Amino acid sequence: MQENQQITKKEQYNLNKLQKRLRRNVGEAIADFNMIEEGDRIMVCLSGGKDSYTMLEILRNLQQSAPINFSLVAVNLDQKQPGFPEHVLPEYLEKLGVEYKIVEENTYGIVKEKIPEGKTTCSLCSRLRRGILYRTATELGATKIALGHHRDDILQTLFLNMFYGGKMKGMPPKLMSDDGKHIVIRPLAYCREKDIQRFADAKAFPIIPCNLCGSQPNLQRQVIADMLRDWDKRYPGRIETMFSAMQNVVPSHLCDTNLFDFKGITHGSEVVNGGDLAFDREEIPLQPAGWQPEEDENQLDELRLNVVEVK
């Protein structure tokens, strides 16, 4: 009996550490990009996946201790996909006491009608979903729209655009919506997917499958995701360093004439960012920038349902 109690305490301790890290990551992202302001009404887009559940949970937790006042309203889009469990999210949100709205739109039927069998439906589905969410945000009086993309999603998008699109473009933590009327935020921008997965497993969120529409996963994105996971295992700290690089861009040492006036460089111009170091040996640190020792993976994997909330 005493041994079981010790295991439970250990599980609780490890979950507390994990939740504190997620809280810290989200808090830093909110502060760095001024994502949430006094009086904001945040529309939390809840898909039923691990990312959006975690986002809602951490935002609720931060709401209790934040120095500013803001409100949350969870929104789910029921796209009428076959087999969608309509009861799951309402039951979960009512149990939490969270304000919510379920928007019912048969986008599944529209996509099936417009897209030939065997072709990917994701692009049209995404456009339809985006428009509905923008409209819903206006109806609810939301000042911000929160999406559940995390650090791994952002890096994957960067490499997708580099490898297949020929441009250095990622996924911004904060942006103006397509219609120019809403501010979209990504509070999980600094969070690692593996932390989110462990947290979701420990909390036993009622996950809704993301493939109900029958669409196949994006093969190109999957290749990139596998590549990043392999790097993360073989080269500790590489992922952190790459993400740090996205926050430390030096336009004068790239090739985009729209970002830097290369034509304006003439005799007598000032040295910019150290000038040309091409002939100098690069000083590479022994450990990648942004790297921190990984916590005991076995301890974090022991997380179960016996949890205590971090206030």
Swiss-Prot record:
Entry's EC annotation: 2.8.1.-
CC terms in the record's Gene Ontology section: cytoplasm
Protein keywords: 4Fe-4S, ATP-binding, Cytoplasm, Iron, Iron-sulfur, Magnesium, Metal-binding, Nucleotide-binding, RNA-binding, Transferase, tRNA processing, tRNA-binding
A GO biological-process term: tRNA thio-modification
InterPro entries referenced in this protein's UniProt entry, alphabetically: Rossmann-like_a/b/a_fold (IPR014729), TilS/TtcA_N (IPR011063), tRNA_Cyd_32_2_STrfase (IPR012089), tRNA_thiolation_TtcA_Ctu1 (IPR035107)
Parts of the chain that traverse the membrane: none
Compartment list: Cytoplasm
Metabolic or biological pathway: tRNA modification
Motif (PP-loop motif): 47-52
Chief place where the protein resides: cytoplasm
GO MF, one example: ATP binding
Reactions that this protein is recorded to catalyse: cytidine(32) in tRNA + S-sulfanyl-L-cysteinyl-[cysteine desulfurase] + AH2 + ATP = 2-thiocytidine(32) in tRNA + L-cysteinyl-[cysteine desulfurase] + A + AMP + diphosphate + H(+)
Cofactor(s) listed in the protein's UniProt record: Mg(2+); [4Fe-4S] cluster
CDD domains recorded: TtcA-like
Residues that bind [4Fe-4S] cluster: 122, 125, 213
Note: The thiolation reaction likely consists of two steps: a first activation step by ATP to form an adenylated intermediate of the target base of tRNA, and a second nucleophilic substitution step of the sulfur (S) atom supplied by the hydrosulfide attached to the Fe-S cluster.
Known function: Catalyzes the ATP-dependent 2-thiolation of cytidine in position 32 of tRNA, to form 2-thiocytidine (s(2)C32). The sulfur atoms are provided by the cysteine/cysteine desulfurase (IscS) system.
Record note on quaternary structure: Homodimer.
PANTHER family linked to this entry: AMINOTRAN_5 DOMAIN-CONTAINING PROTEIN, SULFURTRANSFERASE-RELATED
Protein family: Belongs to the TtcA family.
Protein name: tRNA-cytidine(32) 2-sulfurtransferase
Species, as recorded: Shigella sonnei (strain Ss046)
Gene name for this UniProt entry: ttcA
